[in-house]
């Protein structure tokens, strides 16, 4: 069904029950929010039935009640969105409105939305007692409750009537059409006026329910002054049928689209046309039953075949006609290249003949050219000329709307993808900068450099220079990734900030951007954890576990964001320089701390330090230093978040760390190891 039906159902539920109820309906029916109500989209009947079933279940109302409620709301909603004037101007009474409902339905389907949908048909009869008998035909059984809601609401809003609709009969039959067999439901409604309508003084006295036949008075001269030739030229596409549905006469323009042999009087109309709408067998009785409907007939001959047949002999043309009829019987008729006629069937006064007053069903310039026609083929009085020009503009508007809907859908997809990419970018920025600083930067705040009391740590691999000459570059990168991955885990675990890595040098800081008085204690624990983690990575040259060289210093630093395109959080000050010297002047397998770090660490924590003595630091002279041995407050297992094997490991874990360092120092290294001259060594990465 057409998307407008879904949208009106959505409006009904939201207005009467709220947005939350509609979301429940969507969840139950399996529709994605925003994809269930695309107005110009065609949904399968199954989709619509699932949607209505979900509404019925969520609201705990029967489906018949939902359909009747929808029928009434459909009129209200349609009049709200711009169809008000058209609905009110259709007829002065309810019977006339119902008689013209087919044409309105056809106009909306085929002209406004260009949808070619399979709609219902209506026929209204007036009873002697003033009541109406409405015949409703549809190929979708079970939807007649919509008609009850529609007719009641139209009577109330347009004609100020309070009516009752009673189902008098409901039958189903199988109808054989050219395109196959289908089930058709026929429902008969009896319409009664419950209360006399309220009429203003300036309103016509004509009944609002039924029509009154006009009185033409005496006709002075009943002789027709128009000849058959003039009539055929004035109505160039008409034809007249008898009770046997055989051709009696036709308009001039039909000879340009249909072979002359088929337009001879007495030719069965089924040899010339097939019926598209209403979907009924093309015979005299059915035409009379649907006399108020819009009839669309399709010529069985294409324009190209007609031109080809004009050059044939009479016998060849007869053979071609027979071949054409065989194609129709085998459903090989191509819809796109056969002219359609749209118009009205009218019973003549003899009651034995029907005239079909019609025009080519052409709604655009492209279709006009397709049949080899020009605007001059339409009489000046024919509104089809104006319709073609107006609909050409309408098609452009519909195309623009479809493009806008496609663009909106694409924009939603791009917005979602952009949000995903933005989250990735934010995540990367938060990895590059402290989380607090990254949030301030993303919110557009101006960040001023700040002064902090913090502890800075540098560590490196003293044996790294021995590895470079004997390892492939990709193996070196793999080795550093393995080491730094383990160090990063300790940094995240202990809540300090990793500033940067340069070659094999690793720099971290504690106490910024969120100040803590335990910055020295935290960094000492990080150093012990890193020393433990490094023991699981093997030196590919010496075949021994790696030893880190670590240096710590505490003091005042300046920190701030440098750069805009690629912002970095940088540290400045003498504290950074001295921490770097603590590392470069340190010993492999040892954690060297300045006296400032020693003092700060002992204020908040409990550690075992071994005095190293005074060492000469460039620019500072002799500086008192200490080696950090162990923490008396936390075990290795608590620092590294590793589970202790009670059958193998000591309680604190520092004994294993000391033994590991002693074994790894069988080959003694000073602070500046010499490069290994044995270039024949092989490099293997564990």
Swiss-Prot record:
EC numbers for this chain: 4.6.1.2
Signal peptide: none
Binding site for heme: 105
Residue ranges that the Swiss-Prot or TrEMBL entry lists as coiled coil: 306-335, 398-432
GO molecular function, one term: metal ion binding
InterPro entries given in the database record: A/G_cyclase, A/G_cyclase_CS, H-NOX_domain_sf, Heme_NO-bd, HNOB_dom_associated, HNOB_dom_associated_sf, NO_sig/Golgi_transp_ligand-bd, Nucleotide_cyclase
Claim: Transmembrane is one of the keywords in the record: no
GO cellular component, one term: guanylate cyclase complex, soluble
Biological-process GO terms, alphabetical: cGMP-mediated signaling; chemosensory behavior; response to oxygen levels; sensory perception of bitter taste
Reactions it catalyzes: GTP = 3',5'-cyclic GMP + diphosphate
SMART domains named among the record's database cross-references: CYCc
Cofactor annotation: heme
Cofactor binding, note field: Binds 1 or 2 heme groups per heterodimer.
Tissue spec. comment: Expressed in a small number of neurons, corresponding to URX, AQR and PQR neurons.
Domain Guanylate cyclase: 455-583
Binding annotation for Mg(2+): 460, 504
Domain of life: Eukaryota
EC class (word): lyase
Keywords: cGMP biosynthesis, Coiled coil, Cytoplasm, GTP-binding, Heme, Iron, Lyase, Magnesium, Metal-binding, Nucleotide-binding
Places the protein is found: Cytoplasm
Additional record remark: There are two types of guanylate cyclases: soluble forms and membrane-associated receptor forms.
Record's subunit section: Heterodimer; with other soluble guanylate cyclases.
Similarity comment: family membership: Belongs to the adenylyl cyclase class-4/guanylyl cyclase family.
General function of this protein: Synthesizes cyclic GMP (cGMP) from GTP. May be involved in sensitivity to quinine by regulating egl-4 activity through the production of cGMP.
Protein name as it appears in the record: Soluble guanylate cyclase gcy-34
Species assigned in the record: Caenorhabditis elegans
